[in-house]
């Protein structure tokens, strides 16, 4: 089964997936891609614009996970306005949801933060601090956390996620804050794979050339 992991970051969502799947990760920042590769040595890692990579390659995969950048959607945007900083919400989020819903024949999930505005497309589910849009059912999951994410140190975040970044990686706290909790990533993948196996034959959906 082939999985595409877009805007992969250092791979919080992917940490517990194991090695039974063929995973391709796409990350635009080289230093982040390097950290991901060191943590997930069996994955193919592509340094590229994930949004463009998606439209050019979506037919090669059985399952797609996309986590478009969240800052322009987050509630911090309203706080920044008090400092005279204004920004448009990045519509790539909704472009990908709509595109995948209408043109992708496998299973997909798009993840983002809970926004400061009413969502333009109704999400499938809210888990932890995130919303998820998918074309398969996702069952509820409660995430236990004994710290404030906004104030947590990189050490606390590293322990929570079970991710130890390579020593020379910069922006460790930021990268760890951006991670989807690994147990959430595994839960959603299991939902996607279970639904996929009921409805499709892996790696034949788009032809044998994959």
What is the predicted function of each stretch?
Residues 1-3, 21-22, 113-120:
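Short, charged low-complexity linear motifs
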